[in-house]
A protein has these predicted regions:
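Tandem repeat scaffolds
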Residues: 1-94
Length: 94
């Protein structure tokens, strides 16, 4: 799935994107509020300024992802791999 397809499906009301592969995708400013991204591959994805409020990111691969200024209020990050992920206040290392 590419970024355009993801945005079109989300705009049409789809919220279930579990196991989606968006490795290295550019998702700046994307609105994915409430999306199910369980076990999604978001490794090295650019998620700057993304709206991920209430999203299910459990077990997601976010290694090396750029989450600078992303909105994560209420997001489920349980068991997500955030090693090397960039945040607006620093990078996560182990």
């Amino acid at each position: 799935m590419d970024t355009t397809e993801l945005q079109m499906l989300y705009a049409a009301g789809e919220r279930d994107f579990h196991n989606v592969d968006l490795c290295s995708a550019t998702l700046c400013y994307i609105d994915l509020r409430g999306a199910n991204l369980l076990r999604a591959n978001l490794r090295h994805a650019n998620l700057r300024w993304a709206d991920l409020r209430q999203a299910n990111l459990s077990w997601a691969d976010l290694r090396g992802a750029d989450l600078s200024w992303a909105q994560l209020d209420g997001a489920d990050l349980s068991s997500a791999n955030l090693k090397g992920a960039k945040m607006s206040d620093g990078t996560i290392h182990d």
